[in-house]
Amino acid sequence: MRKVKQNGSVTEQDYQPVLNVALKLLEIPEGYELNSVFGRKQNESDVWVFRYEKLNGENNGLNGEHYSFTVDNESHEILGVTWMDQRFASGQQLPSEKLTKELAQTFLNRTQPGLFDRLENHWIRPHDELITANGKKVIVTGMKYKCYLPEEDTWAWVIVGPEEKIITFEQRIKWEGGRLTEKWLHDIWLDMGNKIN
C-alpha cells in the first residue's frame, strides 16, 4: 500500500472516523486504493476530500481515473462522490430515464435516507465529463438525474453510467447564475488553480 498524501498536520486519527462512516455507505471499486486525504472548506463548512486511485498506478494523477468523495466533517454526511474511469467511456448503452430515476432513488435511500423524497426532479439527460487514460482524452458519459431542494435552495444530482453504476452524486450545490459551491471532485476545476494540496 502506498503512502497516503495528506495536507499540513492532518493525521489518520483526524479523518479515520469520518472515513469509516463513508465506507459503510460507499463501495470502493475493485483495484482502487486510498491515495490522498485533504481537509477543505465547502460552502464554508469543514469537509474531508478522499481520493482513491488505481493500485497498479495506471492513469493516476490529476485528470486521470479516480474514485473520490467529500464528507462533511461534523455531520459525516456524504456531500459528493465521483467515479471517473475509462470503463464508462461514451458510446455505451446508458440506462433509460425510468431506470436512472430508480437507481438514483436506491442510491440516495442508502446514503442519504429521506433526501430523494424531498427533491424536485428538473430533468434527466446524458452528461459528459473528460478524463485522460493511456495518454488520450476519454469522454465519460452517464445519465444525470438533476434535482432542486426547495427547503435549502440548493441543487443535487445523481449520474448513472453504463453497467448501471453510480458515477457521480453531489448535493447542497449552491447556484446563482452559475455554480458557487467548490468543486473538489472535479479535476478540471482543480487544474485551473483551485489546488487540493
Regions picked out by a protein language model, each given a short descriptive name:
Residues 1-197:
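Long, terminal "pre-/pro-" and other extracytoplasmic accessory regions
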